[in-house]
Amino acid sequence: MDIATGALLWDVTHDMALRGGPTIIGTELIAVIDMDGRVFVYQLADGTLFWQRTGLPVNTIIYGATSPAFNASELVLAGAGGEVSVHQIQTGDILWTDTLASLLPNTPLESLGDILAHPVHDGRQVYVISQAGRFAAFDAQSGFMAWEHPFAGSQLPWIAGDSVYLVTLTGRLVSLRLSDGMIRWVSKLKGALPEGKAVSDDGPIYLGPIVASGQVLLLSQNGQISRFDAMNGNALGSTSIGGSFDTPPTAASGYFVTLSSSGNLTVMR
């Protein structure tokens, strides 16, 4: 749609519902993923199909999907069955592929293996976390796994400086060093599962994290915003905005933005 007038510029109809994306790639392309895991890349100017690729076939999927990530000439896909792949943006050719499916699942949730957290590409490494209990960093060019930790998550890892921050399905906020994956600190969140307990679908739900001004911010499902020191993980306080939340918060131009399940938009400075 035209941003100034709202006029329809082009549209494309798919034979299956879309579940991932859209991801804008530079100024020329846009990528989406359908329920079958198929990837479609279109030209932004007129909606012409640029290339498409078939996804990994699986018997069971969890509704919802990651959005592709990109950096320079590489497009990162992660999703059903724990599959991770990096493609050449201009051709769709696969550069490398791997999986973060659990080798020894302890629960039905872990056995599904689907990746719900968006992958991250920082130009050097690709970071992906699965709900099956695997968080890994891969060399973006070769696909070599640089390091891995047994963390399960469904939220986008956040990179700030030389650290990556993530929230686990067991209710832990974790900071790691990007270069080698060394754990800097771990903070136990309210409602966290006991140490050693397997991930289940009744664990605490936290959305985020977001890192800004030296603080790590998390939003709980019941509208509690918690703040932590990015250097050491110490709790700095919390604010309740009420409501129920399923959508992760975002940050832009010094503002913290949330959207509740009932459609209420809250903007905080």
Cite the ranges covered by each PLM segment.
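Short loop/turn segments that connect beta-strands within beta-propeller blades
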Residues: 2-5, 43-47, 89-92, 139-142, ...
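Extracytoplasmic beta-rich repeat domains
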Residues: 8-26, 49-72, 97-121, 145-161, ...
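Hydrophobic beta-strand positions that form the internal "hydrophobic ladder"
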Residues: 29-30, 75, 126, 164, ...
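Structural signature of WD-repeat beta-propellers
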Residues: 34-35, 79-80, 130-131, 168-169, ...
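Extracytoplasmic and endomembrane cell-envelope/extracellular-matrix remodeling and assembly machinery
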Residues: 83-87, 93-99, 109, 138, ...
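Loop/turn-rich, solvent-exposed surfaces of beta-rich toroidal or solenoidal domains
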Residues: 163-178, 182, 186-227
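C-terminal closing repeat unit and adjoining cap/tail of repeat-based domains
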Residues: 214-263, 269
